[in-house]
Design a protein with these regions (language model features):
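ALDH superfamily catalytic-core signature
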Residues: 67-74, 78, 88-90, 94-96, ...
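Short acidic loop-to-helix transition motifs that present clustered carboxylates
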Residues: 33, 83-88
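Short acidic-hydrophobic sequence patches enriched in Asp/Glu that either
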Residues: 58, 62, 105, 158
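Conserved small-residue-rich beta-alpha loop and adjacent elements
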Residues: 1-77, 144-145
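Glycine-rich, histidine-containing beta strand-loop boundary motifs that form or position
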Residues: 28, 38, 55-56, 83, ...
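Short alpha-helical segments and helix-capping/turn motifs at coil-helix boundaries
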Residues: 8-11, 86, 169-170
Length: 189
């Protein structure tokens, strides 16, 4: 993807005269309760989907709170929140009304959704680039959010600011937060 292609796609949903939309399934990991609604907002307001959030059983307790907070969107039919385990998630991933999936979680869950259960058939699918999932999926898996420090002439205050933010991100990751930075890369000229 080059800059021109990225700019052409930026906010492209808003330029469509008759957007297609559809139902986006949000499968949130259980460690950060704020991520599923944030992912739903992105799918709704940036990409034009109505959303179905399937709560992780670890965070089912926050579902009623989200239902109350998001009642205006739920009442108008733009959002639903459902509960259950992996069986419910598997059913929803294959439901004919689901047009898009976003998952926050493990690569094992992602691969189960995209390629199927472990075994010879999964390996065949991977080798042939033939996923069992035939709809788009976006994934935030196992914390693959590196921080890159690019070469620049930084002032001391800028370096201190960057350092504080990196320490905060790494500290957050002690909680297993998929959105915090686990890796730090230095780019040399």
């Amino acid at each position: 993807v080059d800059l021109a292609a990225a700019r052409a796609r930026q906010a492209s949903f808003f330029a469509q005269k008759d957007p297609t939309g559809g139902v986006a399934l949000i499968l949130g990991a259980g460690n950060v309760s704020s991520i599923p609604p944030m992912d739903a907002f992105t799918k709704m307001f940036v990409e034009g989907f109505v959303c179905l959030i399937k709560m992780n059983p670890v965070n089912e307790w926050v579902g009623p709170i989200l239902e109350k907070a998001l009642a205006p969107m739920i009442d108008r039919g733009y959002l639903r929140i459902v509960y259950g385990g992996g069986d419910v998630g598997a059913y929803l991933c294959k439901h004919p009304t689901v047009a898009d999936i976003h998952i926050t979680g493990s690569d094992a869950t992602h691969d189960l959704i995209v390629w199927g259960p472990p075994g010879a058939e999964r390996e065949r699918r991977k080798a042939a680039h033939d996923p069992q999932l035939k709809i788009p999926i976006s994934s935030e898996l196992g914390n693959v959010s590196p921080v890159a420090i690019v070469p620049w002439t930084y002032r001391d205050a800028e370096l201190a600011f960057i350092a504080r933010n990196i320490v905060t991100m790494i500290t957050n990751n002690w909680l297993g937060d998929l959105a915090s930075a686990p890796d730090l890369g230095f780019i040399r000229e």
